[in-house]
Amino acid sequence: GSFELTILHTNDVHARLEQTSRDSGKCTGEDCYGGVARRATKIRQIRASHRNVLLLDAGDQYQGTIWFNYYKGREVVHFMNSLRYDAMALGNHEFDNGLNGLLDPLLKNVKFPILSANIRPKGPIASNISGYILPYKIINVGSEKVGIIGYTTKETPVLSNPGPYLEFRDEVEELQKHADKLTTLGVNKIIALGHSGFMEDCRIAQKVKGVDVVVGGHTNTFLYTGSPPSNEVAAGNYPFMQLSDDGRQVPVVQAYAFGKYLGYLNVTFDDKGKVIKASGNPILLNKSIQEDPAVKAEISRMKVQLQNYSSQEIGRTIVYLNGTTHACRFHECNLGNLICDAVVYNNLRHPDDNEWNHVSMCIVNGGGIRSPIDEQANNGIITLEELTAVLPFGGTFDLLQIKGSTLRQAFEHSVHRHGQGTGELLQVSGIKVVYDLSQKPGKRVVSLNVLCTECRVPTYVPLEMEKTYKVLLPSFLAAGGDGYYMLKGDSSNHSSGDLDISIVGDYIKRMGKVFPAMEGRMVFSAGSL
């Protein structure tokens, strides 16, 4: 007979353990979403009312709130174990604290398999991690065997810190090898679970023979059938049906991000393991779903240490960090310089023969800098609390690949209505821009020079319109915020990075004392006075 399987799935939760606001920031009012206590309730209800349930995570549990800064993944282990996840695929952010920060706490302490078929250890560390990262796992669900194969984005070495001894191989080739192996072992129901983005998920569904369902992540893709329940706009139906090269309809799913939804897919297989029906929708975890009291109590208990942590000294400033509105929205501000310098530092990777680094430029919208830090108050001591006042939105600094012409367009947008105190003026690092405000909007950029990367002595050189550049920027801008529609990244050119306050905090800690200056990174030419 046929076999009905219910797949519950999360991806890109990014340390949202507590419930959040509608846009996945701090929950302040009544209208709150997600959080692990609320997810626990929904999972319990579905396990009680459905026979064959799998709970899967497609990676990027790590990084995104102060929970991760403090607990470093112990919080992920604790709550994923208590929610009884069946399997997790590794995302790029699981490597943010290096291989050691992945091994312990995560790999050594979870009670479920961690999967990735396309990561190949080489050299000295191969023995340390053998047995901790599996290519696939066969799970008994009811009377049937289900094979789950994991995969992780090939971009991980550029996006995170996996170190020199892990090789990230082509997803389709590696998945095919393991799908063939599972088929040989007599497993005819196979799920690919991984973290390479929606376009790659679809390519896997199209190319890999034997894979019946693809559960993905990385691009925070929201799929929905019918009219969406909140403010996310659907990129396609749920499940998205991809026609495979061998003529099958393969359901592909993703559940947005930040634990705001719980992915819910019902799949019916015939006795040969062929998918005959697939339906479902992500479930919005809004306040109509009660938070599980036991889980909620554990969150409260663990939160106490967070509060102590956020009031500890990180470092000091010996100058006024001007993050005022009338500075950062009108001209260069030294706090903007500090933030962007920290972001470039955070993205230093292994240099190669061509480049001292893969990226040299950062931009941040002045409106995203929400508070100054006064060096005369409290001896200039900087804590995480102060940084959270400067950068309160819990955003990340992401990597975008764009053409020079697009970057120039962004700098025109930066001053298209200069003087009104709007938030789009760009603070920078690795960029020198000259504006002439006497010109018409759209024609105000006099010159735009950028720091070379393919050079042994970094120098500012003119931006080339046709060349592709990498730029670091707030996730808010990569989503087209503040009118920067030209920067709206699609999954092929945009990768999410680390939490803003943790980047700036780590930099200040490393420096001990900071004294950012006004450096003429942004200049208004005489014609505009």
UniProtKB/Swiss-Prot annotation:
Residues holding Zn(2+) 2: 12, 60, 92, 195, 218
PANTHER family referenced in this protein's UniProt entry, alphabetically: 5'-NUCLEOTIDASE, 5'-NUCLEOTIDASE-RELATED
Keywords: Disulfide bond, Glycoprotein, GPI-anchor, Hydrolase, Lipoprotein, Membrane, Metal-binding, Nucleotide-binding, Signal, Zinc
Site (Transition state stabilizer): 93, 96
Lipidation positions, renumbered (GPI-anchor amidated serine): 525
Propeptide residue span(s): 526-529
Glycosylation sites: 308, 322
Region forming the signal peptide: 1
Entry similarity comment: Belongs to the 5'-nucleotidase family.
SUPFAM superfamilies found in the cross-reference section: 5'-nucleotidase (syn. UDP-sugar hydrolase), C-terminal domain, Metallo-dependent phosphatases
Catalytic activity, EC: 3.1.3.5
Known cofactor(s): Zn(2+)
Organism superkingdom: Eukaryota
Principal subcellular localisation of the protein: membrane
Record-annotated disulphide pairs: 27-32, 328-333, 340-362, 452-455
One Pfam family it belongs to: 5_nucleotid_C
InterPro entries xref list: 5'-Nucleotdase_C, 5'-Nucleotdase_C_sf, 5'-Nucleotdase_CS, 5_nucleotidase/apyrase, Calcineurin-like_PHP_ApaH, Metallo-depent_PP-like
Catalytic activity: a ribonucleoside 5'-phosphate + H2O = a ribonucleoside + phosphate
Topology with respect to the bilayer: Lipid-anchor; GPI-anchor
Protein name: Snake venom 5'-nucleotidase
Biological role: Hydrolyzes nucleotides into nucleosides. Snake venom 5'-nucleotidases are widely distributed among venomous snake taxa, but there is a lack of information about their biological activities. They have been shown to inhibit platelet aggregation. This effect may be due to the liberation of inhibitory AMP or adenosine by its action on ADP released upon initiation of aggregation. Venom 5'-nucleotidases are also known to synergistically act in vivo with other toxins like ADPases, phospholipases, and disintegrins to exert a more pronounced anti-coagulant effect.
PTM notes: Venom 5'-nucleotidases (or a part thereof) may be released into the venom via exosome-like vesicles. They may be attached via a GPI anchor to the membrane of these vesicles. Soluble forms of 5'-nucleotidase might be released by cleavage of the ectodomain in the exosome-like vesicles or venom gland cells.
Tissues/organs with expression: Expressed by the venom gland.
Gene Ontology cellular-component terms listed: plasma membrane; side of membrane
One annotated GO biological process: AMP catabolic process
Protein residues bound to Zn(2+) 1: 12, 14, 60
